[in-house]
Amino acid sequence: MVRNLDDLDFHLPSHAQDMLEGLQRLRSLPKLADVTLLVGDQELPCHRSLLALNSPYFHAMFAGDFTESFLARVELRDVEPAMVGQLVDFVYTGRLTITQANVEALTRSASRLNFPTVQKVCGRYLQQQLDATNCLGICEFGEQQGLLGVAAKAWAFLRENFEAVAQEDEFLQLARDRLATCLASDLLQVQPEQSRLEALLRWVRHDPQDRAAHLPELLSLVHLDAVPRPCVQQLLATEPLIQESEACQEALSQGHSEELPGLPQKMQEVLVVVGGRALEEDEDGGEEPSHHTGNFAFYNTKARQWMALPDFPDYHKWGFSLAALNSDVYVTGGSRGTKTDTWSTTQAWCFPLKEAIWKPVAPMLKARTNHASTALNGEIYAIGGTALDAVEVERYDPYTDSWAPVGPAPKYVSNFSAAGCQGRLYLVGSSACKYNMLALQCYSPVTDAWSVIASPFLPKYLSSPRCAALNGALYLIGDNTKKVYVYDPGANLWQKVQSQHSLHENGALVPLGDLLYVTGGRWQGMDGDYHVEMEAYDTVRDAWARHGSLPRLWLYHGASTIFLDVSKWTQPFIPTAPQEH
């Protein structure tokens, strides 16, 4: 008699991989491959269905009513045989090796044959390679191959690093129209403005015979009224390109004596701050205040004055993180509510400088509080601050308005800071739960891999560490000490530099020009007065100087730097009333 048994649903986990590996082996047997691709002098046996699954180009070819739909041998033209071979191997293995030597050819072939996955990963590889020597070429290549996100990020890199890019050979090869577009950009971050003029003259000197005729017109794109008068006078007296052209002399003289309408005249790098809960609100017992006060401002370091920006709409928040990318400000995560009723959020906000209004963007994949965020290679990274006992990471692409997960850091830390430096993400922190020692961890976007760096002289412990990158080095401070440390990634070495004048709690460490600004409050005296002074560190002189104070007694805030036209924002920051633009 047969017993009644439950049905058995059998699943072989390795089946899909085994099938692909088997098909890869069977490709060499002509009877078991149903099409052969002819590329140059190479013959590539393969299977129509697999090609069609990976490429809309091949899907249309084999599923449609074309001659190739019925042929056993299909010739492909205008593609490189070696690259097609790599694409076909990818179809069967899901593996691809992208290098600086093959990325352009591979991208062209993937674009020609419409392999979207390969196009995407090649685009990401190019994006992570961006630097001053190649951003112009990558921008043009991205436009040619339809990688518009890559082109946009390369253009943004140019705007943020114009002075460095202008010193490279690629800049000298720019076509006249592309140079004009570059010089005319309102968001070009140059300081001082004469850098724009010097870059233009360098471009013309590279080929004066063909380019000198364009100089008068291109001079109109330079904010000449912002160029120091001695510089203009020197050019008029000594520069042959100017002396040989009456049109150039007139443009230079008039441009410096008259304000050009419609052009931003006072682009300047400034410190921006979004404030959360303030001391007076905390003393009210954590209840929601009956009115809102200003919470978004910038500090004009030249005038030493705080000016109002449109309020961040989520008032009295804490635990959020602030980062700036392409002079747009991003605020992510955080908690709000009373001391007994708080919650983390996935919220993400952006303040696009052109629109000058706060807008919600795609929410994060994970709710985060007391996390870190930083800009790296045209994206925003959010690190840590989730409920899990792991440092979970995700990145935001402003071009697609989407978040994507990144592998977690190998070591768990709860007391940490992060910064992008030389194309990599550095995470410095410790955990009271597992180990007190600070650990230095590094994420490479190119290889999509984390590593733990054993580095000599890394400080043993810092309370609430804060780090920032400046001129290729990583600077580190903490709440519990005035000491300042600097890390050289190339030498893998830490060393001490000049100490701060004061302690700074719950603040930020922000690079601005060639200086580092530190914000944050400190309790002083027996009466417990709360002070919010700022300091600035000169890396050349190895010296700190006190530099004003925060406009409110914020117990929590976020800070970064952006370029904006200070002449367009003229309302002083008055913390006792809401700010409007």
From Swiss-Prot:
The keyword Repeat applies. Kelch repeats lie at residues 280-327, 328-378, 379-423, 425-472, 474-514, 515-564. Keywords: Kelch repeat, Repeat. Residues 135-237 form the BACK domain. Signal peptide: none annotated. Pfam families: BACK, BTB, Kelch_1. Residues 33-100 form the BTB domain. It comes from the Eukaryota. InterPro entries: BACK, BTB-kelch_protein, BTB/POZ_dom, Kelch-typ_b-propeller, Kelch_1, KLHL30_BACK, SKP1/BTB/POZ_sf. This is Kelch-like protein 30. It comes from Mus musculus (Mouse).
